[in-house]
Amino acid sequence: MKISFHGQSCIKIITGDTTILVDPFISGNEKCDLKAEEQMPDFIVLSHGHDDHVGDTVEIAKNSGATVICNADLASFLAVEDGLENIAPMHIGGKRQFSFGQVKLTQAFHGSQTVRDGRIVNLGFPTGIVFTIEDKNIYFAGDTGLFSDMKLIGELNPLDVAFLPIGDNFTMGPEDAAIAARFLQAKLVVPMHYNTFPLIAQDPHKFVASLDEGITGKVLEIGEGIEI
């Protein structure tokens, strides 16, 4: 399995002949190396409804026929407002089997809304995501602040990789993310959600260096991947 990082919180997971795109903020994202019109994933997974995470989901899903996995409220919005038909609604605490493995949604402390035709639309609760693929557990925290139940996430799902936001201001910053890494006890910690715009400017290498002894961190450059 290969997991690659494409700026902000966009990651791509390739397992066998299946491609999973997570939070595909591509158009308008100078930090992303992908082109929306070239993406043909089998699945798109969304952590929440903010524009810098939903991104190009509608265009990509319509072009590729990808199944969109997300919280039930966001799923309803994408179906009614954008005409998406191939959607797998879920909610926090639930898990579901797919052809590539299992998805479980966890809590996240953030918001989830968009503006459509001049009105603010609430798109349900934000989530984190635990993927179980090829007997590996990958935690994608989404946008969140630090919370103590991250310990429970790590205990229930021994983690091979954890993707954690470090940008501060809208999510936890590097100091809190280092505590999150301590709580989760993942084999590998990868920072995300930083340097896309000035308010979330951070030094990811400094974050990795700050991790507790025994916790391994890795900064993925744009387009770089890891094999697990």
From Swiss-Prot:
Annotated signal peptide: none
Presence of keyword DNA damage: no
Alphabetic keyword roster: Hydrolase
Presence of keyword Repressor: no
Gene Ontology MF terms: hydrolase activity
InterPro entries the record matches: Metallo-B-lactamas, RibonucZ/Hydroxyglut_hydro, UPF0173, UPF0173_UPF0282_UlaG_hydrolase
Similarity section: Belongs to the UPF0173 family.
HAMAP family on file: UPF0173
NCBIfam families: PRK00685.1
Protein name: UPF0173 metal-dependent hydrolase Lm4b_01588
Taxonomic classification: Bacteria, Bacillati, Bacillota, Bacilli, Bacillales
